[in-house]
Design a protein with these regions (language model features):
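Membrane-embedded alpha-helical bundles that constitute the cytochrome b-like, heme-associated redox core
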Residues: 1-190
Length: 190
């Protein structure tokens, strides 16, 4: 679910930045409705992830990982979940306050959450935008931390996040194979 969320967030941000660049009013509205639909999907997926998270065992930390890094990892995870839940709700509230609606993937309308209120809609758009940029920053921090663990600390943090079929051997174990060590056996033995 991690990578599905990541892919959907990439799509949501691409749509958000494309809406105002749309060549026509029709494509503008189509991008906007798709952005809203994918945002609702992210919210549902995040709720499912939280349920899964509450039932699943927490992943093992690298044994040499300092307590401060563990606290930072948990805090950033909770912050990501909070923003992933808040962002679509703010978007839905803003849409309702504008007097607009969400056509969920063009197959059905979601009900308005609040009555039309244009001044509130502007404030909600500001909040939605601020949370969006906060999410981008937190996602950048998340990716940077994963790369730091993989390339600097050489632990299994990044590989543990990969889908099972795509898992690579961690950097720390790459030289452990006899054929890759400095004193490698003859090619026939490999």
């Amino acid at each position: 679910m991690h990578w599905l969320t990541a892919g959907l967030m990439l799509l949501v941000f691409a749509l958000a930045f494309s809406i105002d660049l749309a060549p026509s009013r029709a494509s503008h509205l189509a991008f906007l409705q798709l952005h809203r639909s994918v945002g609702v999907t992210v919210w549902v997926l995040t709720m499912a992830r939280l349920v899964w998270r509450s039932l699943a065992e927490y992943p093992n930390w690298p044994s040499d990982m300092p307590q401060t890094m563990r606290v930072a990892a948990v805090a950033s995870e909770y912050a990501l979940y909070a923003l992933l839940l808040a962002q679509p709700i703010l978007g839905l509230l803003q849409t309702s306050a504008r007097g607009d609606h969400v056509d969920l993937f063009f197959i059905g309308q979601l009900p308005a959450l609040i009555e039309q209120n244009r001044p509130l809609a502007r404030q909600l758009l500001t909040a939605h935008t601020a949370v969006g940029f906060s999410l981008l920053g937190l996602i950048a921090l998340h990716v940077s931390a994963a790369l730091f663990h993989h390339f600097w600390r050489r632990d299994d943090t990044l590989t543990a996040m990969l889908p099972a079929a795509a898992r690579l051997r961690p950097l720390s174990s790459r030289a452990e194979h006899p054929c890759e060590a400095d004193e490698s056996p003859s090619r026939a033995e490999c």
